UniProtKB/Swiss-Prot annotation:
This is NADH-ubiquinone oxidoreductase chain 4L. The chain crosses the membrane at residues 1-21, 26-46, 59-79. Belongs to the complex I subunit 4L family. It catalyses: a ubiquinone + NADH + 5 H(+)(in) = a ubiquinol + NAD(+) + 4 H(+)(out). One of its GO terms (cellular component) is mitochondrial membrane. GO terms for molecular function: NADH dehydrogenase (ubiquinone) activity. It comes from the Eukaryota. GO terms for biological process: ATP synthesis coupled electron transport. Its EC number is 7.1.1.2. Core subunit of the mitochondrial membrane respiratory chain NADH dehydrogenase (Complex I) which catalyzes electron transfer from NADH through the respiratory chain, using ubiquinone as an electron acceptor. Part of the enzyme membrane arm which is embedded in the lipid bilayer and involved in proton translocation. It is found in: Mitochondrion membrane. It comes from Polypterus ornatipinnis (Ornate bichir). The keyword Lyase does not apply.
Length: 98
């Protein structure tokens, strides 16, 4: 495993561990998801440049576009949750109530 690959794997695992262990606020969960997507984007871009393949050259841009859509959807859910419940605490959200 190269040094660069280890760095991006560690960044992804830190985002994943932050997502699993720190589930108090919706905003912190969204930030962990964005960190994971950023590490995936950089790793995919580095992989495409190392292999010098033109077949997968559009994959990082597609991942970046999906990440932007995910961020927009997450922020809209954050605003809707803050308006409906008054805060973004995940413990206050009960999915069984309408």
């Amino acid at each position: 495993m190269t040094h660069i690959m280890f760095t991006f794997s560690t960044a992804f695992m830190l985002g994943l561990s932050g997502l699993t262990f720190n589930r108090t606020h919706l905003l912190s969960a969204l930030l962990c998801l964005e960190g994971m997507m950023l590490s995936l984007f950089i790793a995919l871009a580095m992989w495409c440049t190392q292999n010098e393949t033109m077949m997968f050259s559009s994959a990082p841009l597609l991942l970046l576009a999906l990440s932007a859509c995910e961020a927009g959807l997450g922020l809209s859910l954050l605003v809707a949750t803050a308006r409906a419940h008054g805060s973004d605490h995940l413990q206050n959200l009960n999915l069984l109530q309408c």
